[in-house]
């Protein structure tokens, strides 16, 4: 009896086909061998670089919002819209991105998004080119919005591909880890932007340096994606679910998702988490400003927020790959995130408590970001056989919609904050606001969403069950042949 399932890495011949030692997959499915390829790590690396650069471009102005507003002679609200435009554009584009990923495949999604990302980053640099901005004009902000809009179109493609990548290229015991690595490269970009922007923009004129710095990795990602990704899937699938990869038609899949009770609960609660964390990432500098914390400290807190998020996501990803306890991990992280959000809403009201604020930001990232990769895998598990692009994409679209609502709501709940002297974070003290009420509402939303998910979310792991049944059928066929 030939061995049917192989998890070892295989080499490839010059024609790009796998070198198999046993039977090749037959059309009737009764003989199949699963293979993994070293090339999957290159594809993962390109997606990570692309996702990281896209996030850097998104959040690049938020850590230096006050300096940006002064340089381009606009209000803080306009600077906030540079981040908000990502969420607004991602909603209509998200449905097209889900269709493209599930219909045309990973290759086209990655290459197309990399070109949008690169062109958008270059257009942003037009804001500081003297020839394009005559003296006395305020056209620079329009170049920023145009570039941000192109990068925003790329974002859904970038955010929706990790689950598809994990399913198509990685075996079942590596899927959650691959999803974690690809997913967390996006907050890595946020982390780097929180460090780079305040470090570079110590003076208004250094805005030009910042724009140039963020363009370089976007160009590199485009070159690697265009030249290096040659196929939308490996020649031989890595798992049973990848072998049986035919998913529901796009419209039928969306309809099936919206009638799946477990998925709808996950979509709304997971989306709420995305929306809240998007708002915190965009406003962190302004949230800490009203108690006298500097831009640099806000950048450090943002970096800690993401760094500990990596740790949480990494640990949870490895744990879930080995135990398959998706529900338990996500519910635990939701509960701990809710408790930490309450602590965050309280500690930001104290002055000169840098250690305490930094610790709470670290814990918020540790528990909050751990939900993302495991939550995406859980979305696929509870909605199988709907395509991965659709199941994760709809959850992210929910997050973008809620992100817009929360960003507008939190800004409306702020109050002008009177200062007795210049703030260490703001050049224009009339535009410093008290965010304490907004953060209390944020904590309430986190707590409510966590309770809903913990109490009402229940599901079977449909993809894992399908793989178990498939492998069991193969073993039965092989036994009869022997």
UniProtKB/Swiss-Prot annotation:
**CDD domains in the record:** MFS_MFSD7
Lineage, opening ranks: Eukaryota, Metazoa, Chordata, Craniata, Vertebrata
Native organism: Xenopus tropicalis
Q: How does it sit in the membrane?
A: Multi-pass membrane protein
Membrane spanning residue stretches = 41-61, 81-101, 109-129, 150-170, 181-201, 206-226, 264-284, 296-316, 330-350, 355-375, 390-410, 437-457
Q: Which GO terms describe its cellular component?
A: membrane
Q: What is this protein called?
A: Solute carrier family 49 member A3
Please provide an example of a Pfam family that matches this protein in its UniProt record.
Answer: MFS_1
Record-linked PANTHER family: MAJOR FACILITATOR SUPERFAMILY PROTEIN-RELATED, SOLUTE CARRIER FAMILY 49 MEMBER A3
